[in-house]
């Protein structure tokens, strides 16, 4: 057995020696590596020049083009189009309208971040803010105060207006399921025509019925949003039923003493709504999460829950003793920014 193994080893050694001799006398041996042009931009997916070592360059084969090399493709800009004179000035809350079909106009408010430079803009996230039932967009903008935070500096904030000041899925809604999702898509496409927005960083935040609308986007349009935050949310069953496949980062904030939309779920306006923990568990399953992590205490007092191994993060903040409000401690707007600005598709 050992003699056979030794003979095989000697045969392999002879073969390797032949290969080494052949490579030493190869006509390509010793060819200098051509240096890259100074200041040449790195291509997407390429290695840095100093990582290439002595790898020889590969030249294009001449197929009749007199030795011309094909130009390298330029990096792809996810949103190369923008208007250097856009309709809405940065730092101002303005009114806009979009046609959602058949000449039907719907209204929204928009605040373009103060750091947005129309002539040389960077890719900018977009945040949709949805108020509760009967809230005007002006009212939600007033109490959420997004413009006074990093949202107002670094994002485009859009406050859509609900028909009859309500959002799809609720028993009092004037729209059918899908109508308000279509409205949001239409606004986004219209804004994208003039601004350099990052489609991988589109978010939604909402209060009460608006929190349900944010969850509806995560459920029914996971391709559209990278993250959502719902505060004191009304999760009527159509909002979170028959979800499309796709993981969306989700933060739910709800008070244990909510007297309007009970924390544990219930009935309202003749229709059932789901409890906060039930909805969070469903999102965790949809996002492929593992077990819940031990909660940690934060200012409030509140318990902050998370999950392990999610395709997109799922978090829940259970605010002890809080009623049906846009919470100030911990501050919902600050929590929303801290959670959302890390999310990206």
Regions found by a protein language model. Give the residues of each.
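The conserved beta1-alpha1 loop
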Residues: 125-132, 232, 254-255, 320
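Acidic beta-to-alpha connecting loop that harbors the catalytic carboxylate
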Residues: 162, 256-259, 264-267, 320-323
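A domain-start/cap signature at the N-terminus of enzymes
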Residues: 2-9, 19-126, 205-229, 235, ...
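Conserved alpha/beta-hydrolase "acid-adjacent" motif
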Residues: 259-264, 271-275, 327-329
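Alpha-helical scaffolding within the catalytic cores
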Residues: 140-147, 234-242, 298-305
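Active-site nucleophile loop of the alpha/beta-hydrolase fold
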Residues: 162, 229-237, 255-258
